[in-house]
Amino acid sequence: PDEQEKTEPWRNYVTCLNDHLAGHNPLIGREMELERTIQVLCRKEKNNPLHVGEPGVGKTALAYGLAARIEAGNVPERLTGCRIYELDLGNLLAGTQYRGEFEKRLKAIMEGIRKEGHAIVYIDEIHNLIGAGRTGDGSMDASNMLKPYLEGGEIRFIGSTTYEEFNRYFSRSRGLVRRFQQIDIQEPGIEETIHIVEGLKEKYETFHGVIYEEGVIAYAVTAAAR
């Protein structure tokens, strides 16, 4: 990867989720939301899912869960071999103080990803695209610069944002709303939360060097819900 970053500088601004699965907990539950995401990605048009939910409900975990499904080969043929690249918007904006500098950098990233083929771009807190890179004098922001790639179909996008930021920023960009399919990510219920934590129990026991007694997780989840 380091050699690739030297020859392909656009890789400095993205993280390939497929290559970073080992450091993340597996996605447990959320089958309905993940299936809906896959269905949208397989469409011919409006094939860019937008995960909208409160902070902490697991929107980013869904992107990693999809990457894991792709690596396991458990996806439709249209998604087989796809790579999910998370765009680092903060790094992308850093040091771009001159007009045209941001546009040039973003275009280089998108062209690099397009040439890779079978690419999906994941943008966490996608509402930050609106206004990003705009320097005045009629210059475009990132959301406008991405529209040709959103329309072209060669690159698919997954975005995530909160309801508050969606209503405040994203919903006002008609072009983005038209190109993304909203998928609501609700907070899991008590039963689903217990199922999720039970699935992660062994990892936490190993990390903390403890053994959780039977019933402790159900009690903790129920008490937290209250």
Residue ranges and their predicted role:
Residues D2-L21:
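Conserved ASCE P-loop NTPase core motifs with emphasis on AAA+ ATPases
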Residues E5-W10, N25-T37:
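N-terminal pre-P-loop "Q-motif" helix
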Residues M32, R43-G65:
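Walker A/P-loop nucleotide-binding motif
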Residues L41-R43, K107-E111, I123-R156, T162-G175:
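Conserved catalytic/switch belt of AAA+ P-loop NTPases
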Residues N47, R83-I84, R114-V121, G152-G159, ...:
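Loop/turn-to-beta-strand initiation segments
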Residues A67-T80, L92-L93:
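Post-Walker A helix-loop "phosphate-sensing" segment adjacent to the P-loop in P-loop NTPases
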Residues P76-E77, I120, N167-G175, Q182-R226:
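Conserved C-terminal "switch" segment of AAA+ ATPases
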